Amino acid sequence: MFFKLLKDALKVKNVRNKILFTIFIIFVFRVGTHVTVPGINAESLKQLSDLPFLNMLNLVSGNAMNNFSIFSMGVSPYITASIIVQLLQMDIYPKFVEWGKQGEVGLRKFNQATRYITLVLAFVQSIGITASFNTLSSISLVKTPNVSTYLLIGTILTAGSIIVTWLGEQITDKGFGNGVSMIIFSGIIASIPKMFSTIYEDFFVNVRSGELTRSYIIVALLIVVGLAIVFFTTFVQQAEYQIPIQYTKLVQGAPTSSYLPLKVNPAGVIPVIFASSITTIPSTILPFFSKVTWLSHLQGLLSYNTPSGMITYAILIILFSFFYTFVQVNPEKTAENLQKNGSYIPSVRPGRETEKYMSSLLKRLATIGAVFLAFISLAPIAAQQFMHLTSSIALGGTSLLILISTGIEGMKQLEGYLLKRQYVGFMNLED
């Protein structure tokens, strides 16, 4: 189905150009991930390869942290800045609430504020990460560790993060898919060969002859679990709850009944990306507050290789699932639009009652989505910790979630482009 859809899409010039543009932008990003920051001893990173903090950073940076490249920060600062801006819109900061009522003008102001916050976060986190890695590695990461070197590295990494964010925006505006998701998606795809190579070495090369049977069993279980994750993720991400809609007789040309589709997991994979980004923050700012004891405890609390870290990661995913569900679907606006269009939900009064009904339904759907996302993300981490498996397995669930969700959204976008083209062609024939 996918290949047929892709074949049909490539026949359409506009869609083909979008796909080729996206591939070009991703190529530019991937090239940048191999350009190491000047003044860095990249060999020292090999000692840190098993750190949960580094693995999580690699995930949200699109696998750019392995070489401590100019794009090492990836879209992580932008994701964090987006969370901050969206939270401030919720009756927390009056000016942001006011902007939310200004339509396109307000949206441009939000985008500008997000960019400024991204700039500050990227610079602070860049220096923090460099200092953290330099401290943790026995081989000095920074060849000449002084203030001017740290400022230079921070500036380069900040510029890299801004460029990656801009590349993501170009994909969203002119290309195919969501830019942030596509950047992370490309990094996960690029890391797959290394992951399989690591699994092969850990289970079949660096083992004693008597442990081969155990290795075969574990690998077989991993394949089964991986296929199960693919199946259930695909099912949940495509599942819809259909709310019946009826129209008043006063609406000319409207059908007598229809339905309003809501995804069973309305927030998609964004809560996982948000949670992953948030867990990296304490480690990036810890060098600035090394004497603050509670911050060290917070770093341990957010490290997913500890029981408390796994619980915290799950809680963050659940909280962001509820938060982003109501960002995606606004019950008040939905009720208002239904009333304006002369439509209503059977047995539910238009207006305030419809808003309450939508809020209640969204909470139930968000609960299903949150539990699903948390389970898929946490299961491989728990398995890796309690069965002492290779660290490359830990974020396998999170990676699969992002891969499958981004792939499904991409297919739907392709279908939308093709349907729109067929509709426009039909209308032209009618004329």
Segments (PLM) and residue ranges:
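N-terminal cationic and glycine-rich segments that engage phosphates or anionic surfaces
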Residues: 1-431
